[in-house]
């Protein structure tokens, strides 16, 4: 057995100590009234606005370091904060305060023939670990959603956003202390050492679930090495399939919106599939529209292209021989995120929705709609691409588990 170096032992102890503090905080949060949680969210929003200059100064340090490291423009944009973005982050907390509290919701209840009353109701998960890349807004989003759902958050952000995250979490903790709530409801783990991630995802018995949010490499590493339950989020090799019965005006609008609205997010389209029956007329038009929008088109894509999540103004293009071939292609190369078909044929649409294995399937609609707010249930902590415990946009209910409660009157079970 390899004995860890003292520094690693210290780091593991640091993570475990933080998790234990989070468990203590989570026990209190689990029984907080909704009004108190909402008051805390509004207080946190107020603190963010009051300390906006401090937050922006910290973010400027991160941005300067990122520029010196030749960080790509798309990543700089995700890292960047400005007054408007801070205002938006604060507004997001107020929005969460306005959402329905899932804790205590009764999912089902009934009385047994013997008079024993049973009910199943939602309860918090407990301690939620979040591992994410250089997006400071995720720090506050995670805090808001975990607090409202009665959970404590252990956050491990990217080293590229370390200063920003430290400033944000300090402000959030100040808001909690001001209301005599446990500051350890939100804690930021060190991003200076990658081993922090390992210790977090292996803290079985201390951490109830870990949610990785980032690129494919991050998510695969977490799922591979974790000893605590994980919820996979994010990786989106999304397809737009233009069926032979498609309205090409509609197809062009959906394709451009799916690809170009925000190319760096996980619900952006990465592959265009065109039905062979209309390829001769549809392809030139769709390719011209993409190129006019500044999209680099990858014709004759190889295996790597077909599996790539570009997260940029790039798209792979392939021709398929009918709806069954499109379904087979997507189920082979897709990541189970969001898939779209454009067609006026109801049978083809029905076949597509039934046989595509994905968290969301769109019929004559953009892949960009896979989003908690767009789905009508508010903010999300990520988009799950797995089937257990949650699938699709993860809002407040997905940050809960359930418990059964039985009310009796001296009931005993017969031998």
UniProtKB/Swiss-Prot annotation:
It comes from Mycobacterium tuberculosis (strain ATCC 25618 / H37Rv). Gene3D superfamilies: Aldehyde Dehydrogenase, Chain A, domain 1, Aldehyde Dehydrogenase, Chain A, domain 2. The modification N-acetylthreonine is found at residue 2. Catalyzes the NADPH-dependent reduction of L-glutamate 5-phosphate into L-glutamate 5-semialdehyde and phosphate. The product spontaneously undergoes cyclization to form 1-pyrroline-5-carboxylate. One of its GO terms (biological process) is L-proline biosynthetic process. It comes from the Bacteria. Its EC number is 1.2.1.41. This is Gamma-glutamyl phosphate reductase. GO terms for molecular function: glutamate-5-semialdehyde dehydrogenase activity; NADP binding. Keywords: Acetylation, Amino-acid biosynthesis, Cytoplasm, NADP, Oxidoreductase, Proline biosynthesis. The lineage of its organism: Bacteria, Bacillati, Actinomycetota, Actinomycetes, Mycobacteriales. Pathway: Amino-acid biosynthesis; L-proline biosynthesis; L-glutamate 5-semialdehyde from L-glutamate: step 2/2. The gene is proA. CDD domains: ALDH_F18-19_ProA-GPR. The keyword Amino-acid biosynthesis applies. Pfam families: Aldedh. PANTHER family: DELTA-1-PYRROLINE-5-CARBOXYLATE SYNTHASE, GLUTAMATE SEMIALDEHYDE DEHYDROGENASE. It is found in: Cytoplasm. GO terms for cellular component: cytosol; plasma membrane. Belongs to the gamma-glutamyl phosphate reductase family. It catalyses: L-glutamate 5-semialdehyde + phosphate + NADP(+) = L-glutamyl 5-phosphate + NADPH + H(+). The keyword Oxidoreductase applies.
């Amino acid at each position: 057995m390899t004995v860890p170096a003292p520094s690693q032992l210290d780091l593991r102890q640091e993570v475990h100590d933080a998790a234990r503090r989070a468990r203590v905080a989570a026990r209190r949060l689990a029984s907080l009234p909704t009004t108190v949680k909402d008051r805390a969210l509004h207080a946190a929003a107020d603190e963010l606005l009051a300390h906006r200059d401090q937050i922006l100064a910290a973010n400027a340090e991160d941005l300067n370091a990122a520029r010196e490291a030749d960080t790509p423009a798309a990543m700089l944009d995700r890292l960047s904060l400005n007054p408007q973005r801070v205002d938006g982050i604060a507004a997001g907390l107020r929005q969460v305060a306005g959402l329905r509290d899932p804790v205590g919701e009764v999912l089902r209840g009934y009385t047994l023939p013997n008079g024993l009353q049973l009910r199943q109701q939602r309860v918090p998960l407990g301690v939620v670990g979040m591992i994410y890349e250089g997006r400071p807004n995720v720090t506050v989003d995670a805090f808001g959603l975990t607090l409202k759902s009665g959970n404590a958050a252990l956050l491990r952000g990217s080293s590229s956003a370390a200063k920003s995250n430290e400033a944000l979490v300090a402000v959030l903790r100040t808001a909690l202390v001001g209301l005599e709530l446990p500051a350890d409801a939100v804690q930021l783990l060190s991003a200076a050492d990658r081993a922090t991630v390992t210790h977090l995802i292996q803290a079985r018995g201390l951490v109830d679930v870990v949610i990785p949010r980032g690129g494919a490499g991050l998510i695969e590493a977490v799922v591979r090495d974790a000893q605590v339950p994980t919820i996979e989020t994010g990786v989106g090799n999304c397809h737009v399939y233009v069926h032979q019965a498609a309205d090409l005006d509609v197809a062009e609008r959906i394709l451009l919106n799916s690809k170009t609205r925000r190319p760096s997010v996980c619900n952006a389209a990465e592959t265009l599939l065109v039905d062979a029956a209309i390829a001769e007329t549809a392809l030139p038009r769709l390719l011209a529209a993409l190129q006019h929008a500044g999209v680099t088109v990858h014709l004759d894509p190889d295996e790597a292209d077909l599996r790539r999540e570009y997260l940029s103004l790039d798209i792979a293009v392939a021709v398929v021989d009918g709806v069954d071939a499109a379904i087979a292609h997507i189920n082979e190369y897709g990541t189970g995120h969001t898939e779209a078909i454009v067609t006026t044929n109801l049978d083809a649409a029905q076949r597509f929705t039934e046989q595509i294995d994905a968290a969301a399937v769109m019929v004559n609609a953009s892949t960009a709609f896979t989003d908690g707010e767009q789905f009508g249930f508010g903010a999300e902590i990520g988009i799950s691409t797995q089937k257990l415990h949650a699938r699709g946009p993860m809002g407040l209910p997905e940050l809960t588990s359930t418990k059964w409660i039985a009310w009796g009157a001296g009931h005993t079970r017969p031998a």
